[in-house]
From Swiss-Prot:
EC numbers on record: 6.3.2.9
Protein name: UDP-N-acetylmuramoylalanine--D-glutamate ligase
Keyword check for Cell cycle: yes
Catalytic activity: UDP-N-acetyl-alpha-D-muramoyl-L-alanine + D-glutamate + ATP = UDP-N-acetyl-alpha-D-muramoyl-L-alanyl-D-glutamate + ADP + phosphate + H(+)
Protein's cellular compartments: Cytoplasm
SS bond list: none
Lineage summary: Bacteria, Bacillati, Cyanobacteriota, Cyanophyceae, Synechococcales
Primary subcellular site in the record, as a coarse category: cytoplasm
Superkingdom of the organism of origin: Bacteria
UniProt keyword terms in alphabetical order: ATP-binding, Cell cycle, Cell division, Cell shape, Cell wall biogenesis/degradation, Cytoplasm, Ligase, Nucleotide-binding, Peptidoglycan synthesis
This protein's GO CC annotations: cytoplasm
């Protein structure tokens, strides 16, 4: 249900649950259109206190250390216009269920943004892995061609921040990265002009319970999209080729049997082909790995649908700089390269990164283990790794998996990243090594705020050891 200015609802309360980035901007936007807003946040820290001060100056009530319990809402039930919940709160949370049973509107930040921005062309990008790179790359291609195409959503800029901006009326395209958490609460609300599905592998099953539920949530975005782009290289999407709604398919496989189903592929000369016509060479594409070639094809297919010429796309790609923490080379000297792939938060993304490395890398992995199939990860470790250094909550579990797979090279466990880097520095000096790859294959939440903080700390530790100036992103 949309939130609109309505004199009959004057004085009604819009609760915002969670004071993360999306909650902060949802509250600011709602207040800017004349709504009464109360924000509840279960934690308290310096950053939250600063946000609280900013919102209170806008006449928004903010309560920290406030738990999301139904009893807390009871006295407000007749006054509530809507409750905007953080994507981190499961939609089957008992408080949400009780509120909905009483007819209370429970929505997400994206629902609010959509109501404001629905007359603008949206590109909705989802997938287990690759969605951030595709979002960033496609936005870059469009912006380099004089289209106002900001990226937003799960990539870090809340969509309500875009809605709040006075520049929003001038936007040509919104390039939105949408996670399953965001899609789940906004099902049947968002209707993108173009929907892109990058990959699908088991993830977030602690939240979505079953793989089928996870698939349906992702697919709901594509069903709502006017035009769809899929990745035929993804095994699960490929297996569901016939059941998915019609759309454009891409593949990096030059074999005719595969490309018969696809509109974009890579030929044996390393050219992107569009329906049998050569478009552009991959020679100058900077990103490592076959998974990034898939990301490129998805972005190119969308850019072509929007109407950009091959030459315009090619010129935009020449100036593209990759996002940090994604196969990011942070050190290269003599024969040693050190790569930060902190964004590899599950086994599948880790496999993609390891596959992109030539030779036998030293691999650093660890963190909080997610649900997912480790078979291919163990295989690639056995096939390629010169040594494996494990840290954090999952270190012993990962060690057991690797040893059960028959790994014969060095494998060591550590408490944290600092210990790993201290040892790795000495190990590299005493053993000829070409590549040190930070590929966690796990979430960061055992020791870090997010994968970005984890990646920045990894870089800081490396730079301290190698005496290089560190610049955090």
């Amino acid at each position: 249900m949309p939130i609109k200015n309505n004199s009959k609802k004057e004085g009604k309360i819009n609760f915002v649950i969670g004071l993360g980035r999306s909650g902060f901007w949802a509250a600011k936007y709602l207040r800017s259109i004349g709504k009464r807003v109360i924000v509840w946040e279960s934690k308290e820290n310096k950053e939250l206190l600063e946000r609280k001060k900013i919102l209170e100056k806008l006449d928004i009530s903010v309560c920290l250390n406030k738990q999301f319990l139904f009893d807390e809402f009871y006295k407000f039930l007749r006054q509530i216009e809507s409750i905007v919940v953080s994507p981190a709160i499961p939609f089957d949370h008992k408080t949400i269920i009780k509120l909905k049973e009483r007819g209370i509107v429970v929505i997400g930040e994206i629902n609010i943004a959509w109501e404001s921005l629905k007359n603008i062309n949206w590109i909705g990008i989802t997938g287990t892995n690759g969605k951030t790179t595709v979002t960033h790359l496609l936005s870059h291609i469009l912006r380099e061609n004089n289209l106002f195409a900001p990226f937003a959503g799960n990539i870090g800029t809340p969509l309500c921040e875009i809605a709040y901006s006075t520049k929003s009326k001038n936007i040509d395209w919104i390039v939105a990265e949408l996670s399953s958490f965001q899609i789940e609460i906004a099902t049947h609300c968002i209707k993108p002009k173009i929907g892109i599905w990058t990959t699908f592998t088991p993830d977030h099953l602690d939240r979505h319970k079953t793989l089928d539920n996870y698939f349906k949530i992702k697919n709901s975005l594509l069903k709502q999209s006017e035009f769809r782009i899929y990745n035929y290289d993804d095994q699960y999407l490929k297996e569901n080729f016939k059941s998915l709604l019609n759309g454009i398919w891409i593949t990096t496989n030059p074999n005719v049997s595969d490309s018969d189903h696809c509109d974009y592929w890579i030929n044996n000369e390393n050219f992107i082909v569009e329906r049998r016509e050569k478009l552009l060479s991959l020679k100058n594409f900077k990103l490592k790995g076959n998974h990034n070639t898939q990301n490129l094809l998805l972005a190119v297919a969308a850019a072509r649908k929007i109407g950009l010429s091959t030459e315009r796309i090619k010129n935009a790609l020449l100036s593209y700089e990759q996002l940090p923490h994604r196969m990011e080379t942070i050190f290269q000297r003599d024969e040693l390269e050190i790569i930060n792939d902190s964004k590899a938060t599950n086994f599948d993304s880790s496999v993609a990164g390891i596959n992109a490395i030539k030779g036998s890398p030293i691999i650093i992995s660890g963190g909080r283990l997610k649900n997912g199939d480790s078979i291919e990860w163990v295989k690639i470790i056995n096939k390629k790794a010169k040594a494996v250094f494990l840290f954090g909550e999952s270190s012993q579990t990962l060690k057991k998996l690797i040893l059960e797979g028959g790994f014969k090279n060095d494998i060591l466990t550590f408490n944290d990243l600092s210990e790993v880097i201290n040892y790795a520095y000495s190990y590299i000096k005493n053993n000829q090594s070409e590549t040190l790859l930070f590929s966690p294959s796990c979430s960061s939440f055992d020791q870090f705020r997010d994968y970005e903080q984890r990646g920045d700390i990894f870089k800081k530790l490396i730079y301290e050891k190698f005496n290089i100036k560190f610049i955090a992103h």
